[in-house]
């Protein structure tokens, strides 16, 4: 099981991910696209890296907006896995 990060470690990580914010026990980013089709295309691009990491985001879709939430459920909060996957998603 991944080790849960401390608040200090989380803040240090967040400083490297300015588009992400901490919401409760997760990190969240909202992506905005031209239309629904582009939003769905982006969601489909999340599948392969999430499967490869065996770490799956919670995803909300609202027309041209995609909200991605990351947390490590079995650790009860944020771990390095969340920030690693956030970095991968930022590259897409």
Curated annotation (Swiss-Prot):
EC number assigned by the record: 4.2.1.96
Catalytic activity: (4aS,6R)-4a-hydroxy-L-erythro-5,6,7,8-tetrahydrobiopterin = (6R)-L-erythro-6,7-dihydrobiopterin + H2O
Similarity remark: Belongs to the pterin-4-alpha-carbinolamine dehydratase family.
SUPFAM superfamilies: PCD-like
InterPro entries given in the database record: PCD_sf, Pterin_deHydtase
Keywords, in A-Z order: Lyase
One GO-annotated biological process of the protein: tetrahydrobiopterin biosynthetic process
Top enzyme class: lyase
Entry protein name: Putative pterin-4-alpha-carbinolamine dehydratase
Keyword Lyase: yes
A single MF term (Gene Ontology): 4-alpha-hydroxytetrahydrobiopterin dehydratase activity
Organism of provenance: Picosynechococcus sp. (strain ATCC 27264 / PCC 7002 / PR-6)
PANTHER family named in the record: PTERIN-4-ALPHA-CARBINOLAMINE DEHYDRATASE
